[in-house]
UniProtKB/Swiss-Prot annotation:
Entry-linked PROSITE patterns: THIOLASE_1, THIOLASE_2, THIOLASE_3
EC number: 2.3.1.9
PANTHER family recorded: ACETYL-COA ACETYLTRANSFERASE, CYTOSOLIC, ACETYL-COA C-ACYLTRANSFERASE
Keywords, alphabetical: Acyltransferase, Cytoplasm, Transferase
High-level lineage: Bacteria, Bacillati, Bacillota, Bacilli, Bacillales
Cellular compartments annotated: Cytoplasm
Protein name from the UniProt record: Probable acetyl-CoA acyltransferase
A Gene Ontology cellular-component term: cytoplasm
GO terms, molecular function: acetyl-CoA C-acetyltransferase activity
Main location: cytoplasm
Length: 393
């Protein structure tokens, strides 16, 4: 079977809700990465066969945001593109689709990843197309409903985390401690420059003066403690334990990479970072969507012909501390190998981009001692996706 490799994997900094990227459309964040990847690799843009980009909150952006990003990023009009929505798994699903297209021989080079600007998601006025006869009307927050609401139970994703709290007996202190650890790891990694190799700075033009250049993730907090987090009120349930402090944020960002056949990478003298070994997807009861990575991980390992003990580093999306703790308990993961540079609770969770973001962060950790990695994300609606990669040799 064709060996599929990953190269030139990058991400933007992750902006907080209403932060530095509030006026930067998702497709511009994606275009910044596409332009950088083309420049860095020296690849002829016309040699790219296809562009596949995850993006969840598409309303108001225009037709097919992936196509917009591709053309704004400097690709010729002859290169096709399409947008993927698998909620939080969109970015990783895009990479899987690229992988599949190469294995089948349809493509040799695909630009794949994810992008999201949650700050720019619009308010909707449903059923207003043909006007209202009388009475008050209300707006629907497209970010909350299309991105963060379980449509089957009509409640926020945070309630699915509360459901896992009850099922697994997870305490508030455990969640807050997990969140503090995520922040501390991210602070340490940021201060030590450990994200520098994976981040492409984003220049934001200003009406007056020089552009603002964003180089670091905005959500990383130095002075977080369990004591401070314990003062926060429950966010989703009156007597609950899930708070804004032990959940991932609402964020803006993008992540992208080249997915190639090994033969094409050799032909073009592009040095791969890793080999894609296999993927796994799984579905569960939407009310406990956060536990779905357990089976997705097991499927990915089976398809990769690996055991959990073979994995040197894990990048698992931290949708909620409770969700992460439940998965860790089921899989019995070694904590020293999981999210060693912090996770989404600290870095942020731009939903359509996160699947690609966790893989980018993973790829930049592979070396002669850390040769095999696994990444996974839970997905609203009761799903999960996982992937296994190995350092290219």
């Amino acid at each position: 079977m064709t060996r599929v490799v990953l190269a030139a994997a990058y991400r933007t900094p992750i902006g907080v809700f209403g932060g530095a990227f509030k006026d930067v459309p998702a497709y511009d964040l994606g275009a910044t990465l596409i332009e950088h990847i083309i420049k860095e690799t020296g690849l002829n843009p016309s040699e790219i066969n296809e562009v596949i980009i995850g993006n969840v909150l598409q309303a108001g952006q225009g037709q097919n945001p992936a196509r917009i990003a591709a053309m704004k990023g400097g690709l010729p009009e002859t290169v096709p593109a399409f947008t993927v929505n698998k909620v939080c798994g969109s970015g990783l699903k895009s990479i899987q689709l690229a992988y599949q297209s190469i294995v089948t021989g349809e493509n040799d080079i695909v630009l794949a990843g994810g992008m999201e600007n949650m700050s720019q998601s619009p308010m909707l006025v449903n059923n207003s197309r043909f006007g209202f006869k009388m009475g008050h009307q209300s707006m629907v927050d497209s970010m909350v409903y299309d991105g963060l609401t379980d449509v089957f139970n009509q409640y926020h994703m945070g309630i699915t985390a509360e459901n896992l709290v009850e099922q697994y007996g997870i305490s508030r202190e455990e969640q807050d401690t997990f969140a503090v650890n995520s922040q501390q790891k991210a602070v340490r990694a940021q201060q030590n420059g450990e994200f520098d190799s994976e981040i492409v700075p984003v220049s934001i033009p200003q009406r007056k003066g020089e552009p603002i250049v964003v180089t670091k993730d905005e959500g990383v907090r130095e002075n977080v403690s369990v004591e401070k987090l314990s003062r926060l009120r429950p966010a989703f349930k009156k007597d609950g334990t899930v708070t804004a402090g032990n959940a991932s944020g609402i964020n803006d960002g993008a992540a992208m990479m080249l997915v190639m056949s090994e033969d094409k990478a050799k032909e073009l003298n592009i040095e791969p970072l890793a080999v894609l070994d296999g993927f796994g997807s799984h579905g569960v009861d939407p009310a406990i969507m956060g536990i779905a990575p357990v089976d997705a991980v097991e499927k990915a390992l089976k398809r990769s012909k690996k055991e959990l003990s073979d994995i040197d580093v894990f990048e698992l999306n931290e949708a909620f501390a409770a969700q992460s703790l439940a998965v860790d308990r089921e899989l019995k993961l070694p904590p020293e190998k999981v999210n060693v540079k912090g996770g989404a609770i600290a870095l942020g969770h731009p939903i359509g981009a996160s699947g690609a973001r966790v893989l980018v962060t993973l790829l930049h950790q592979l070396n002669d001692e850390v040769e095999t990695g696994l990444t996974s994300l839970c997905i609203g609606g009761g799903q999960a996706i996982a992937a296994v990669v190995s350092k290219y040799k």
